[in-house]
Amino acid sequence: MGALTIVAKYMIVAQIEVNGGVDKSDIIGALFSQTEGLLGKDMDLRELQMMGRIGRIEVDIQEKDGKTKAKIYIPSNLDRYETALVAALIESIERVGPYPATVKVLEIRDLREEKRKKIVERAKELIKMIEEEILPDTKEIIEKLKEDVAKAEVVEYGPEKLPAGPDVDKSDWIIVVEGRADVVNLVKHGYRNVIALEGISRGVPQTIIDLSKRKSITLFIDGDKGGEMVLKELMKVAHIDYVARAPPGKEVEQLTAKEIAKALRNKVTLEEWLAQQKAGAEKTEAAAPPPQQPTAPPAAPSQQPIAEVPQEIVKRLGDMQGTLEAELYDTNWSLIKRIAVRELPDELANSTDSIYAILMDGIVTQRIVDLAAKKGVKIIITARVGPLTKVPEDLKIVTFEQLQKLA
């Protein structure tokens, strides 16, 4: 196929079959002569070619057994409607010289689309070249610039002047981290709804406690024992919705954008976290040799509350398992309300009902214990018990397993 004489938008590709031996000039001549005047002067092939609306017609010919088969290529600078009309026009050819002939259009290529694909592929190559040739010093400058911008965006929040991102008030959920460097790193990577505890040696800041009452909290801890200590202290006084953790041995301030995104994507609810920690502890205890002086077992539930739990409630334990729901009862063991376990802290804090007992498929946390005690709850029947630092004497906590064994 020869070079094009115009900058074409489309390429008409057709196939012609002639019942006899002919050459290229015969086929091209038939195209011009047999289409002349069919669609008027404006669509005459010679006129279109003279005006540069179609390019040079190329023919790729093959002759076999006295018959001729050829591919016809017509570059077009017309719009798609006119190009389609020209394609249909050449299909009207019935003879080449003295021989019968048929023409069929095989395709109309969009040459601009092919150019676009080549441009995109070349752009990919150029981007790769740019990325490979950026000097390490340049990358360091960019990282330093990002960090400086992030530091400038860090604000002081609350009476304690805690380091925070600029969007703590705007966002419905916030990320709580340990220190200022953690805040700077998260802001640098686009997380602006972050605030720091600034250590827990002097207790959890009241600002964090207040925020936990009105916003969803994700605690993002370091991947070491220190992170676990922060979690234990915070869960005593504040409501934590989710826990995210840095990879083992890494601190939040050291994480890359990809590591931060992965850790936050893999966050779990506080209940799931505590269950995982308990399962890990039980596995470790099972693998370890018996201690010389075994620690005291968890206090056995009082027989008095066990005895007063109605059999209908005991029978409900099987139905409750796996629901992640909580049921609230009055002193007559009449059902007051059934809610999701995650809604229990808010219900205990705001409900005006007199609640005597709670049946819940979840983990009892110190926050739930504190709210239940304040509400006057006397019995909590639960699937699991998390780490507790203080339980009032008049509040009895019993697990499903204990109740089923003793009932």
UniProtKB/Swiss-Prot annotation:
Domain named Toprim: which ranges?
172-248
Pfam families assigned: Toprim_4
**Transferase recorded as keyword:** yes
Its required cofactor(s), as named, are: Mg(2+)
Cofactor binding: number and manner:
Binds two Mg(2+) per subunit.
UniProt-recorded Gene Ontology molecular function terms: DNA-directed RNA polymerase activity; metal ion binding; poly(A) binding
Q: Provide the catalytic activity annotation.
A: ssDNA + n NTP = ssDNA/pppN(pN)n-1 hybrid + (n-1) diphosphate
* Residue span of region Disordered: 279-304
UniProt xrefs under PROSITE patterns? TOPRIM
SMART domains xrefs:
TOPRIM
- Gene Ontology process terms (BP): DNA replication, synthesis of primer
The residues that the entry says bind Mg(2+) 2 are: D222, D224
Cite the record's Pro residues compositional bias ranges.
288-300
HAMAP family the UniProt entry points to: DNA_primase_DnaG_arc (MF_00007)
Family according to the record: Belongs to the archaeal DnaG primase family.
What is its biological role? RNA polymerase that catalyzes the synthesis of short RNA molecules used as primers for DNA polymerase during DNA replication. Also part of the exosome, which is a complex involved in RNA degradation. Acts as a poly(A)-binding protein that enhances the interaction between heteromeric, adenine-rich transcripts and the exosome.
Q: What is this protein's name?
A: DNA primase DnaG
